[in-house]
Amino acid sequence: MEKVDEFLEYIKVSILDKSIVDTSLILSDRDGFVLGKIIDKSSSADNVIDNSLISTFSSATDQASKLHAGNNKSIVSFFEDRIIVHINVSNVILSIITDTESNVGLILGSQDDLIRSLTSLSNSIQSDIQDM
């Protein structure tokens, strides 16, 4: 768990904090089990994200990938008071929760960097699971 929290802190500071403030991050598996999270103090993200929302994203991205337009990498959800960006890589889902004033284009523009980081973390998690 400590490795995951360090990873989330790295993402928040080095990739997202350049341009996006008031951001919470939740890392989970495809079933919605939360592996780690960093909740911004001014955010109510902890109350919003639950396992069912994350696992629903997993199902929705599988269905979206069936549209014959290639694999779906992310889904953006706009709500009245927040934006949630889910990014899926190798059975690991990163949920980015931010306020409605945030620039989603900047988040999606960081997607390649996030995917590279998620891929290495996912491989590390898979390795840890196999060692158990």
Swiss-Prot record:
InterPro entries: LAMTOR3 (IPR015019). It holds the Pfam family MAPKK1_Int. GO terms for biological process: cellular response to amino acid stimulus; positive regulation of MAPK cascade; positive regulation of TOR signaling. GO terms for cellular component: Ragulator complex. One of its GO terms (molecular function) is kinase activator activity. Signal peptide: none annotated. Belongs to the LAMTOR3 family. Part of the Ragulator complex. Regulator of the TOR pathway, a signaling cascade that promotes cell growth in response to growth factors, energy levels, and amino acids. May activate the TOR signaling cascade in response to amino acids. This is Ragulator complex protein LAMTOR3 homolog. It comes from Dictyostelium discoideum. The lineage of its organism: Eukaryota, Amoebozoa, Evosea, Eumycetozoa, Dictyostelia.
